[in-house]
A protein has these predicted regions:
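Carbohydrate-active catalytic/glycan-binding domains of CAZyme proteins
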Residues: 1-343
Length: 343
């Protein structure tokens, strides 16, 4: 039986920590210690006047913010990836940054997409058919740099694309989560589904180097459930003490029980080879209920896109989460990336 080493590992979240910007919706958040000794967060953002809604898919860019310590607050430094033209697979929108460093090179994995037609502006509604069309164009991309400060070189082709419609992952490839071994062998988890509003599932691929070529090592998703209301997304993958380890969001639908009955919770699982996974007996690492450094306790509208900062032994020291305030999930007054130190 798998035990959860992070079941009671979270310390209070620093008030004012993480990364926020009053003029932007902030989402995602992936942190690495740079060659300068500072901590650098790669996050997603889009202008506040556009609304939260669908604009993470139409008007998002990836930025870098930095702090002298892991808790922050992080200060905006630059736009790292933005629009580059409709002819590129990632030319109109980028999201889901996931940063790794190996052999003196920084690898920034992300989701990119493109679309035709008008770019949504303030007050514009995006109907469900257009949203689904662009959602299905999501592909996993990669940018590399010799320094956390750049310059960044973007790959012109996706690292992994959907398969034909005889497979479960025929719509999109998105939400990359990557673990790089010392010899450069790289494992990637990705999200997909077989039809609009179908169950969100996770696949696995492997490459000899962090930049590919990636080949699937399992034809099926890493988890299969009979209940179509069980959705899993936002994987975070790492390798520690001879095991692959996973933190993933329980995103169950239609009032179903999910894996553990707590919607939006982050769940822990382990695997010997990144193929056959087992959830811990008590899998919850975090939920939307947060304890803050000033003693307050709140129920956040969302806590998503989990990312562990790892030390030199690949052991997690801090948990980063995209979060927001509001009366219900995705009904936000503001969003930011928060940080929770671990015991």
């Amino acid at each position: 039986m798998v035990q959860n080493p992070y079941q009671n590992a979270l310390l209070p979240a620093p008030v004012g920590g993480g990364y926020s910007d009053p003029d932007y919706w902030i989402w995602c958040g992936s942190v690495v210690q740079g060659e300068d000794g500072a901590y650098h967060m790669f996050a997603s953002r889009w202008p506040k006047d556009l609304g939260f809604g669908a604009n993470w898919l139409f008007n998002c860019e990836i930025v870098r913010a930095s702090s002298k310590n892991p808790e922050g607050p992080y200060t905006f430094q630059e736009v790292v990836l933005g629009r580059r033209g409709r002819t590129f697979f990632d030319g109109m929108n980028v999201h889901n940054p996931y940063i790794r460093k190996w052999n003196q090179t920084y690898y920034l994995y992300y989701m990119g997409t493109t679309f035709g037609g008008p770019i949504p502006g303030p007050g514009d509604e995006v109907d469900s058919s257009r949203f689904t069309e662009v959602w299905n164009r999501k592909r996993i991309g990669l940018a590399t740099a010799p320094s956390v400060f750049g310059p960044w070189t973007r790959c012109d082709e996706p690292l992994i694309s959907p398969r034909d419609c005889s497979h479960w992952d025929c719509t999109a490839t998105t939400n990359p989560a990557v673990a790089i071994q010392p010899d450069g062998t790289t494992y990637m988890l990705y999200k997909s589904r077989s039809f609009a509003d179908g169950p969100l599932k996770i696949g696995v691929a492997k490459a000899p180097r962090p930049d590919g070529p990636f080949e699937r090592i399992l034809d099926d998703p890493i988890f299969n459930f009979e209940d179509p209301n069980i959705h899993l997304e936002d994987p975070y993958l790492w390798y520690e003490d001879g095991k692959f380890r996973l933190l993933i969001k329980d995103d169950f639908k239609n009032g179903g029980p999910g894996i553990n009955g707590i919607w939006g919770a982050g769940l822990y699982a382990e695997s010997a080879g990144c193929i056959h996974w087992e959830f811990a007996e008590n899998p919850v690492v975090y939920s939307r209920h947060v304890t803050w450094s000033d003693g307050r306790q709140t129920d956040q509208a969302n806590c998503e896109r989990p990312y562990f900062l790892l030390d030199e032994n690949n052991h997690p020291t801090h948990l980063f989460l995209a979060t927001g305030e509001g009366p219900a999930p995705y009904q936000f007054s503001r969003t930011w990336n928060m940080v929770i130190p671990l015991r």
